[in-house]
């Protein structure tokens, strides 16, 4: 049974329990991942294929998925699924197009020029979980902003199914989004191949996409060798409501995240004891009809809660401290809380903006900071796939005008060679 508490300070213990979820990992995971990374670095594709046979499928039909197989999904797939994905792509593209940045240049009468270049990364690796729980939406949410950013090549890795073939829904999404290459491999070995490069898999500049604890650990260990999107923790949702909320909707939304895994967190903060009580009833009722009932029950019992707040302002304060991945506001005037909620991955406003709307269709990215990191991290965006560099051009006159200040600061820092680099030019 989901716990019910009042917002009297006791919620702090709940926050500590939620934060501890990330420490609940096997102590041997990092050791195992390090061994896999070293093996792939030394032995390349041979090691990747060996681990694929061991962990995923002993008889993988191919390593690199042929381009014809990818394109064939466009005609072989369920037309309704194709149309649904195209509608999602349209919305995601429209939203992310607004994020695109341009470089700039500044000059003045002295002839100096300073500016910034913005350009897409050369190659990006996209990890997509495979198997029966495959998510084509992950392809959309990662590949679309990368394409808009100007990334030259997207290399996707995804584990094979047990019969040695790729998941067709994943291939369909890859075809629709213009992914350049697809390899059938997964786990830490696939992440290592993208980071180091092999004979067949290109070395990339950045790796994005969700995965299990082995994938997340590999990304963490390889950060610095390659850039990554973020270290994603278990999924989480926080719902804020007043007395106008429909408990049926609230319960459905809490369970939509609780079903992800047993470490998922689902919390309701409400000003209404009626909403709290009726939500408990709805949770019990709706849970019986859902396929992942056991997972939902476990996550709600261990990392779920209903918190009764004095008012919506207190509810917002608690939300900012928790900094959730997903935050729903179901209240009489939900839009008035936008400016009060600073620490959140994605904000869903009103009775008819449930979290799954953002997972697939609305347009904003569903790759979001978790585990309280929304205090300082942002969702995946076009900006995640660009690099910026500055440039400086000074004329002789412009340098002479600046020389005295530069030399003074350099000598104060006792960097006399810095000062000398300026002085030899202005003395000519």
Each predicted region: which residue ranges?
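N-terminal Rossmann-like NAD(P)+-binding subdomain of aldehyde/semialdehyde dehydrogenases
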Residues: 1-122
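Conserved small-residue-rich beta-alpha loop and adjacent elements
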Residues: 106-172
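Alpha-helix C-terminal capping segments
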Residues: 141-152, 175-177, 195-201, 219-221, ...
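Short internal beta-strands
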Residues: 152-162, 266-273, 279, 350
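Conserved NAD(P)+-binding/catalytic subdomain of aldehyde/semialdehyde dehydrogenases
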Residues: 178-249, 253-256, 260-265
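A conserved active-site cap/scaffold subdomain adjacent to cofactor or substrate pockets
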Residues: 230-302, 306
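C-terminal core of ALDH-fold dehydrogenases
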Residues: 320-428
